Amino acid sequence: MSGSQTLVVKLGTSVLTGGSRRLNRAHIVELVRQCAQQHAAGHRIVIVTSGAIAAGREHLGYPELPATIATKQLLAAVGQSRLIQLWEQLFSIYGIHVGQMLLTRADMEDRERFLNARDTMRALLDNNIVPVINENDAVATAEIKVGDNDNLSALAAILADADKLLLLTDQAGLFTADPRNNPDAELIREVNGINDALRSIAGDSVSGLGTGGMSTKLQAADVACRAGIDVVIAAGSKPGVIGDVIADISVGTRFHAVDAPLESRKHWIFGAPPAGEITVDDGALSAILERGSSLLPKGIRRVEGNFSRGEVIRVRSLAGRDVAHAVTRYNSDALRMIAGHHSQQIAEILGYEYGPVAIHRDDMIIN
């Protein structure tokens, strides 16, 4: 790929700490140097940084605290300001300004908030400012889980309209087996499409300070590739890794973007975490997959979770297959009432209606 590129670089806690209990500042300095070099060459760089909790623990002198959500939020609240200050100081050496964006998944679930976040991201990039993104762990609850910043980096890549997403980790890439305990494990260099076989070999490599594993990196790669973004998983310790990815030099594992990426308005649907799920019968499944039809209430067998009209939900088959992500036209209570009924009965059952379909085909993304 030639010309100016937009690259999102995700740095996990294991990369920022080198597997220790404190931030490895010497290594972070080197990564900033690489980013600054590419920035000076005309490329647009976005940083997705983990490490707030590790920075907070370090600043407080490594207290022995219970491993609870409240403790993680406490450490994140203390560490986040330290972390952004570090990024700001290091990039300022090269005359580069940074702009902090703290996000939660809720910013991606709502279309208006998604567009606002996208506009902020692109304004920063248009003014040669490096966005530094982290999850707002100090207020998030369910968000502090395995894979948050992996998946967040894919969403950041979508917001930035990125060309590539680089997931830096403590492994050289995706292997055929866990290289830590299998000497025959081989590095997978190229991936065209993520399937169940790949998912089954993606073992976890979670450090004590972070919340990410290889399986969540596959999830992030899937989201980004379907949005038309190439993804590379590589070792953060590899010299010149950021420049290599920009220059299309083979490094780590490269996931190629799909040939027909999702249209822009559907990006947020695919990236948003489902607020609930519905199970459809075989007739509805066939209509959705083979004829591209909308989902009628008649085909709904089961509704799980509590969600509002307009939220993203998961559609499953009777066999448990994850069929689609979609925006529902009715809330969960209404769907439970009209499930299995003909569309003509909606108004009679509910006393109102938002149309004859539960999910319109234009608001559905097939997995």
Swiss-Prot record:
GO terms for molecular function: ATP binding; glutamate 5-kinase activity; RNA binding. Transmembrane segments: none annotated. One of its GO terms (cellular component) is cytosol. It catalyses: L-glutamate + ATP = L-glutamyl 5-phosphate + ADP. It comes from Pectobacterium carotovorum subsp. carotovorum (strain PC1). The keyword NAD does not apply. The gene is proB. Pathway: Amino-acid biosynthesis; L-proline biosynthesis; L-glutamate 5-semialdehyde from L-glutamate: step 1/2. Belongs to the glutamate 5-kinase family. PROSITE patterns: GLUTAMATE_5_KINASE, PUA. It is found in: Cytoplasm. Keywords: Amino-acid biosynthesis, ATP-binding, Cytoplasm, Kinase, Nucleotide-binding, Proline biosynthesis, Transferase. Pfam families: AA_kinase (PF00696), PUA (PF01472). GO terms for biological process: L-proline biosynthetic process. NCBIfam families: proB. It comes from the Bacteria. Substrate binds at residues 50, 137, 149. This is Glutamate 5-kinase. Residues 275-353 form the PUA domain. Signal peptide: none annotated. ATP binds at residues 10, 169-170, 211-217. Catalyzes the transfer of a phosphate group to glutamate to form L-glutamate 5-phosphate. Its EC number is 2.7.2.11.
